[in-house]
Each structure stands twice: as structure tokens, then as C-alpha cells.
């Protein structure tokens, strides 16, 4: 339906927005006008959709044959909110904006029924709240998720939702952004969100309901509802305190509380004005920019420049996993959770029994916490089988190797796979550092080989580094990206290099942590500064959790392979004391039996003091700002090299690796966006300053040519 619409008699009814191609359809059935949002994939409220709604409401009110109006969504959803294709463009706020659109609906002289299915989120839910009535089918997801991109709902959601659900329920939804099933909300005592939960088909049911209420006057309106103050007078204070812990350092959740509290004190128009003021204050903030970057970057990560969406994929209906250890078991769970049959291979029955036991224990813990139904647990376990023979996995569509991180061991595995696997099977390695090109070359089918670097625990961590060797076929890349989506991973493509994107950059972060404690910082100070910046854990706590012996083994290899790279000797000194981390009760910190709380260690401090003495170093005072700058900018410089070398396709891919796999604070957007927001000329100046430190690695702090070029041109990574 374009700029104009034809009424039932055939006369052209002109739209007030005649220049806009409408993304809606309009049809009158038995006295009910049905306006369908038709802007796939989620019927986003772009300019043309908003104009179509306003035009349809006006046309229906002008037509004497229309008694009531239904607004619904074409396809599988009602409305997913704003049109992300228009984010940041003039169209996003062009007339009619969402406020005017909702006001037009609310002020309609004829009743407007929202017919909701699939999804009603963000502006879609706000649109529905502006209607006089709302009917919904079971299984619809209802949410106001704006808080997750650093803003508050901007079209009355914080004012209208408390009026129909009550303060407590609305506060929970708005501050978390979590979706809630429609049937749960429809059954909530005293709710006024839904007028009817429909059993049958949505549109016929909505039309029937519209005919029932067509003559009812006065028209109901959320505007007329009052907001009862919460039963607990401290509810808002407690909500703010809880959010300070659960959504640490995030501004938007706190401002959501302010808006909901305003709904209890102001009339609707004043409340909406307050909400709008808060929205406008947040939308241009650094946090909102970072959170939007994360939102779009996650979606962009799945796009590979030379692998178009039309690339054919290979079927993956079952997988094999080699290795039943912690990583192998976690990988198996990823596929079991997605309903994909898994065959797990080990060399000894005891290893299989131990692996199955760990998988069962993980699932049983979820059942005990109410996060997994018993029948779902049993169904997932029924998809798991085991074997001691490579011959039994020959027909798997994909096999993932998760054995010890040693090239010779992995080469033996891939030689066996090459001999037994069916033609076209995808052969994947879970290596975290090894050369996937060389792994592929031990087979006669290198095009079928790809790296799939899962992060531990694999069934929990969202990141999946997809390592593309120089041999990997394009259809293999397309297939593994599709598989990653199925198992709910954020897949980021990396080229082949030592450590790929994540571990290569993380090594520089850890190197700086070592230099900092050599120069005078304490282990606790470095960790606390990193955590105050927003990291989930500081570098030394991460080392204790992962196992300090792992980093030790990697360093011993690099001393041989890269003798010119400078490392602090503190980490070796600590590891050589047998302090391998939490698993042995002592690492950079001491740990009491059965507890994970880190306790400062006198033995570690003595080891650091000895390293300083051996090097003739006098410790100096180091500020928290210097700690953070050196930790983060070391990753930025390495990230710039990674971009220059083509290891990462784009800067946002690097950011997604760090946001989803390394605990980088999401509200800072990742290391590369952080550098952009700091300003690349300032980043270059800081690196030049760090080069003057005689105890650091001056060669490393030479800014990457790409970084220097972008800074000189006034450009950014993203």
C-alpha cells in the first residue's frame, strides 16, 4: 500500500504523508478495519510504518462503514519495536514520530484493538499500550528491552506499563529488559494489560472481539488508570540498591527506576515528559553508544565479506565430539541443548564415564534450580551416545576435536579422522592457539577443516572464535556460522595466527599486568583497578581461575619461538612455587578450602620482591589510571595489528570477542570502541609516553601503523 489508499468504493483517499511508501496494509472486514504492520522481519516501526498507522486510523475514522479498528502484525510477529535499519538516521525521528503515532491511536473516536502475537517489544508494546483494547495469543513474548541498549523506553512505556501491571511487575520488566510470556502476564492478578487471551486464530478472534466492543462508550484508555504506590515504601530504594549490584556501573537501569517512580507521582502527560527528558539525556551518552555498538556488532559479526548469505551450506544433523573432558563435555552440551544428537569418543571407558557424569551433574544442577524441566533433561541425555572407536563416528556430519593442546596429539587425531570420516564431513579443531593451517594440512581434505575455539565452560560462554584457515572452503564457513547460531553462540571469524584474536590480545594484557607488579603495583591493586574499570575479574584472578600452569606452558614455548619478546618473570616465579591457581588452593592469591574468595599471599609478594631485587628495581607508586591505560591500550595496539594483518574482518569483531568471551565491560563497548571514544590521537600520545618507561617493552608500545594513520586522519577504528 503506497502513498494513497483506495477506499472500498474505489475512490482514492489521500494520505497526509503522501511522499512515503507505506509499510502497512489496510482492509475492512465486516465493519472492522484491519491495519497490518508489514515491515519484515519484525514489523519495525520505521517512518513508513508509523505513517501507515496514522493514515489507517484517520481513514477508518472517516469511513462510516467502519465501526472498530484492529492493529496487528503481518507474518510471525506483532511488532519488535524500532526499525533498526533507521537507527541514527533522520528517518528515525521524522514525522510522524512514535509519540504522535500513539497519540493518534489513543485519540481515535472508534475503538482500536491491538491483536498481538509472536513478539511485542519496545515501541511495539508501547503502541499496543496506546490502543483501547489488547488481545493476545499464548506464547507471545512481551518486553521493553531498551535498557539493554543504554536507554529507557521513549514512547510512554515507563508510564503506561505500571498502570496496567502494577509497579512491581513493571519495574522488573523495565529494569531488566527481560521478555515475559503473554499467558503469564494475562493470568497476573489485577492485570489490565490484556483484555482477552485468544485460543484460536488471532485476526478472526480480534475482529470478533472488536465487533463485541464496537459500541462501548466511553472508550477505555490506559491514560485513565491510576498507578498505585508499591506496597513497600522502600521499593524504589531497594530496587536501586539491587541494580547497583546486579547491573553494576550501568546508568540506564537506575534511570528506569526514576521513570517508574515518576509514574506514581505524576499524571500521564507529565510522566511522559519526564520520561522523554531522561531518554534524551541517555540516548547520546557514552554508555548508550557502547551498548548500541554491542547490539549491532553482534549481528554484524556473522557477516563474512566474501561469503554471501546465498552461499550453500552442508547439512549438520548430528555431530561427534572427540574428548570427554571439561571442554569436550561442554561442547557436547551445546549441541544437546539445541536438540542435535552427539556421539562422544574417548580412548578409555573410564574417561567416558567421568565425562557423562559431569554432563549429568551439570544438567541435574539446572533441574534442581528450576532452570530445566526433568523431561527436557532426559530428552537431552537421550541424544548422547558414546564410543571408543573412530569407526563409529564415520557418518557424523561434523566432528569437533577437543583433546590436549599439543600439535602432535591433534595431528594424530586429524590423520585418523581423514581416514574414517565420510566425504563432506566438517572437521573442526577446538584449538586455542595452534596453527589451523598446519592441522588442515595433515589431512587430504584441508578445505573441510576449520577451527572452532569454544571458551570454557563451553556450555555457558557465548563466544565462539571461528578460525578460518587458508584452505577452509566457503561452504564450510557458511555452515559453521549457521551452526553457531543454532547453538546460540556469538561467532566471530578469525584468521590464523598465534592465539587468534582473543588470546593474542589477552597475552599483551597479561604481559602488562606482570610489568606493573614488577614496577611497584600490588597484585590486588592491579585486579581492583581492572575490576573498577568494569572487567568481570582482574588479570590475576583470571589466571588463578584458568590455571597458572597453562600460561606457564605457553610462555616456555614462546621463549623458544620468540626469544626477542620480553616477559616479566613474576608469573614464572609464582608458578614454580606450585601455585597453579584455585584448583590447588593457591595461585596469585591464597584460597581457603572450599572457598573462592582470594586472600593476599605473603609468599607471592616475597616472590615478586625477589624478582625486583634480581633486576635491581626500586618499586614506584603506580596510579590506578596508569594501570587501566596500560592494560587496555596494550590490547588496542595489538588489535590494530590484527586488523592490519587481516586476522579480524573489522574492529567491531574484536570488540565482540572481548565483550562475549573476556569479561570486558559491555558499557564500554570493547577495547577498540573504547579507544575510539578516548580519541585515537590521545591513544597514540599515551603509547609514546609508555615507550619511555625503561622497565616496559618499548618496541611493543610503538603504535601500530594503522592506529597512527587513523589518528592522523581524524578517523576511528569503528
Predicted feature locations:
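Residue-identity detector for glycine
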Residues: 4, 9-10
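Glycine- (often His-adjacent) and acidic-residue-rich active-site loop
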Residues: 73-104, 120, 148-151
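Gly/Ser-rich catalytic serine loop of serine hydrolases
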Residues: 118-124
Amino acid at each position: 500500500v503506497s502513498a494513497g489508499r483506495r477506499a472500498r468504493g474505489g475512490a482514492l483517499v489521500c494520505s497526509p504523508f503522501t511522499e512515503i511508501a507505506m509499510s502497512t496494509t489496510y482492509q475492512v472486514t465486516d465493519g472492522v478495519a484491519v491495519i497490518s504492520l508489514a515491515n519484515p522481519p519484525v514489523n519495525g516501526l520505521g517512518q513508513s510504518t508509523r505513517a501507515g498507522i496514522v493514515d489507517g486510523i484517520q481513514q477508518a475514522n472517516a469511513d462510516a462503514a467502519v465501526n472498530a479498528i484492529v492493529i496487528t502484525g503481518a507474518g510471525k510477529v506483532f511488532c519488535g519495536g524500532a526499525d533498526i535499519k533507521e537507527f541514527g538516521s533522520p528517518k528515525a525521528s521524522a514525522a510522524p514520530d512514535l509519540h504522535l503515532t500513539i497519540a493518534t491511536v489513543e485519540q481515535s473516536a472508534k475503538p482500536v484493538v491491538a491483536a498481538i502475537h509472536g513478539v511485542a517489544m519496545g515501541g511495539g508494546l508501547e503502541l499496543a499500550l496506546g490502543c483501547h483494547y489488547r488481545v493476545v495469543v499464548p506464547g507471545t513474548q512481551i518486553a521493553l528491552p531498551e535498557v539493554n541498549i543504554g536507554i529507557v523506553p521513549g514512547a510512554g512505556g515507563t508510564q503506561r506499563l505500571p498502570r496496567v501491571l502494577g509497579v512491581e511487575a513493571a519495574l522488573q520488566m523495565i529494569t531488566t529488559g527481560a521478555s515475559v510470556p503473554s499467558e503469564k502476564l494475562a493470568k497476573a492478578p489485577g492485570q489490565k494489560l490484556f483484555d482477552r487471551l485468544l485460543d484460536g486464530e488471532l485476526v478472526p478472534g480480534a475482529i470478533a472481539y472488536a465487533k463485541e466492543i464496537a459500541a462501548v462508550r466511553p472508550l477505555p484508555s490506559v491514560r485513565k488508570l491510576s498507578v498505585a504506590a508499591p506496597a513497600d515504601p522502600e521499593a524504589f530504594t531497594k530496587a536501586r540498591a539491587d541494580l547497583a549490584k546486579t547491573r553494576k556501573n550501568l546508568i540506564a537501569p537506575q534511570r528506569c527506576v526514576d521513570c517508574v517512580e515518576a509514574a506514581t507521582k505524576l499524571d500521564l502527560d507529565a510522566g511522559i515528559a519526564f520520561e522523554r527528558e531522561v531518554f534524551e539525556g541517555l540516548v547520546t551518552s557514552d554508555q548508550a553508544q557502547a551498548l548500541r555498538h554491542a547490539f549491532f556488532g553482534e549481528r554484524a559479526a556473522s557477516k563474512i565479506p566474501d561469503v554471501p548469505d546465498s552461499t550453500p551450506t552442508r547439512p549438520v544433523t548430528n555431530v561427534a565430539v572427540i574428548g570427554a573432558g571439561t571442554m569436550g563435555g561442554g561442547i557436547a552440551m551445546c549441541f544437546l541443548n539445541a536438540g542435535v544428537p552427539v556421539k562422544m569418543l574417548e580412548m578409555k571407558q573410564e574417561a567416558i564415564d567421568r565425562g557423562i557424569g559431569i554432563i549429568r551433574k551439570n544438567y541435574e544442577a539446572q533441574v534442581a534450580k528450576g532452570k530445566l524441566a526433568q523431561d527436557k533433561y532426559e530428552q537431552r541425555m537421550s541424544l548422547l551416545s558414546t564410543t571408543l572407536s573412530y569407526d563409529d563416528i564415520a557418518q557424523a556430519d561434523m566432528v569437533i576435536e577437543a583433546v590436549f593442546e599439543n600439535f602432535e596429539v591433534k595431528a594424530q587425531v586429524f590423520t585418523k579422522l581423514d581416514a574414517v570420516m565420510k566425504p563432506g564431513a566438517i572437521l573442526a579443531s577446538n584449538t586455542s592457539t595452534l596453527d589451523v593451517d598446519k592441522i588442515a594440512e595433515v589431512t587430504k581434505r584441508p578445505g573441510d577443516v576449520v577451527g572452532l575455539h569454544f571458551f570454557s565452560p563451553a556450555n555457558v560462554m557465548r563466544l565462539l572464535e571461528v578460525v578460518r584457515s587458508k584452505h577452509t572452503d566457503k561452504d564450510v564457513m557458511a555452515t559453521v556460522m549457521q551452526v553457531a547460531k543454532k547453538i546460540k553462540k556469538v561467532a566471530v571469524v578469525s584468521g590464523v595466527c598465534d592465539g587468534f584474536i582473543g588470546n593474542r590480545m589477552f597475552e599483551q594484557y597479561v604481559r602488562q599486568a606482570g610489568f606493573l607488579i614488577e614496577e611497584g603495583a600490588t597484585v590486588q591493586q592491579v585486579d581492583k583497578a581492572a575490576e573498577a574499570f568494569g572487567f568481570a575479574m582482574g588479570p590475576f584472578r583470571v589466571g588463578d581461575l584458568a590455571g597458572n600452569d597453562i600460561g606457564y606452558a605457553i610462555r616456555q614455548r614462546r621463549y623458544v619461538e620468540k626469544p626477542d619478546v620480553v616477559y616479566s618473570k613474576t608469573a614464572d616465579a609464582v608458578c614454580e612455587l606450585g601455585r597453579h591457581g584455585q584448583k590447588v588452593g593457591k595461585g596469585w592469591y591464597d584460597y581457603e578450602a572450599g572457598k573462592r574468595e582470594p586472600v593476599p599471599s605473603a609468599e607471592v609478594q616475597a616472590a615478586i620482591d625477589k624478582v625486583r631485587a634480581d633486576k635491581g628495581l626500586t618499586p614506584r607508586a603506580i596510579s590506578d589510571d596508569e594501570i587501566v591505560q596500560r592494560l587496555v591500550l596494550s590490547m588496542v595496539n595489538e588489535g590494530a595489528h590484527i586488523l592490519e594483518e587481516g586476522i579480524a574482518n573489522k574492529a567491531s569483531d574484536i570488540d565482540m570477542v572481548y565483550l562475549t568471551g573476556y569479561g570486558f565491560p559491555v558499557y564500554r563497548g570493547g577495547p577498540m570502541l573504547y579507544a575510539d571514544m578516548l580519541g585515537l590521537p590521545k591513544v597514540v600520545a599515551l603509547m609514546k609516553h609508555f615507550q619511555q618507561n625503561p622497565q616496559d617493552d618499548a618496541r611493543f608500545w610503538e603504535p601500530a601503523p594503522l592506529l597512527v594513520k587513523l589518528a592522523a586522519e581524524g578517523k576511528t577504528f569503528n
